[in-house]
Amino acid sequence: MTKDVLATFPAIEIKKNESLSHYTNTKTGGPADYVAFPKSISETKALITFANEQNLPLTVIGNASNLIVKDGGIRGLTIILTRMKQIHASGTKVVAEAGAAIIATTKVACGASLTGLEFAAGIPGSVGGAIFMNAGAYGGEMSEVVETVTVLTPAGQLKTLDHDELDFGYRHSTIQDYDDIVVSVTFGLKPGNQTKIQARMDELNTLRAAKQPLEWPSCGSVFKRPTGYFTGKLIHDAGLQGHRIGGAEVSKKHAGFIINVDHATATDYMDMIHYVQKVVFERFGVHLQTEVRIIGEDVVQG
């Protein structure tokens, strides 16, 4: 590295050789060479420009809730956007920066008596991550409420994408197809009754707590739903609930979750994912595709 990122950006918190297990919801993941925590779009843009100029590999993550970082970690510069978290409501719109928590965004919408985001009340991710994968729950998904998304291109240019340009599909948006980085999102909502909005959010959070193993570290829903099947039922019917590899276990509460019950590693998670895929395919002929984003490098043996 010809220039030191720490010396170049004294105003931005940057950590060297930092374990990403401190930031992922699974509490697993290897070290990142450098982790930066920008607080604004301008700081993020400056970091991207620096990485390009220095030929540094660049990885951007949000709340790391539906993410597995392999035990070998991530080379180059990793940007975590969770300090870019401003949210404001204006008229029937809510604008949220990419690092804002979805849960916090739903609370702002409710406070402004705006309806449409209730389905997301318990989704643990960031706004940017939710757009990246078109997150959804309880019959709703981001594609139904997003108006525009502002991104930084790999060249460091700001660009606004409208709904059609995002080409939303099941757990997919065009953000996955390019190297653009989401920096803010505008949600188009409708006027509603605040009491009813809050009641619906409370109802969904109660449902989520009853059905999902929220008391354990996990990466949320591991697999996409195959057409014509329910993922949890396939895994349950394969007899895999309670199966453990290392410290990773298929949840007894919800078969679609793999939880960290005893100091699991990312390798435990990867081994469990592959095992579940293998058994379900052997039993039912169905290939489970991962919904969780998997990044980073394997541990170098030697």
UniProtKB/Swiss-Prot annotation:
User: Pfam families from the xrefs?
Assistant: FAD_binding_4, MurB_C
Which InterPro entries does the entry mention? FAD-bd_PCMH, FAD-bd_PCMH-like_sf, FAD-bd_PCMH_sub1, FAD-bd_PCMH_sub2, MurB, MurB_C, MurB_C_sf, Oxid_FAD_bind_N
Q: Which UniProt keywords apply?
A: Cell cycle, Cell division, Cell shape, Cell wall biogenesis/degradation, Cytoplasm, FAD, Flavoprotein, NADP, Oxidoreductase, Peptidoglycan synthesis
Record-annotated FAD-binding PCMH-type domain positions: 27-192
UniProt-listed GO biological process terms: cell division; cell wall organization; peptidoglycan biosynthetic process; regulation of cell shape
Please explain the role this protein plays, according to its UniProt record: Cell wall formation.
Q: What is this protein called?
A: UDP-N-acetylenolpyruvoylglucosamine reductase
Q: Which organism is it from?
A: Lactiplantibacillus plantarum (strain ATCC BAA-793 / NCIMB 8826 / WCFS1) (Lactobacillus plantarum)
Question: What gene name is given for the protein in this entry?
Answer: murB
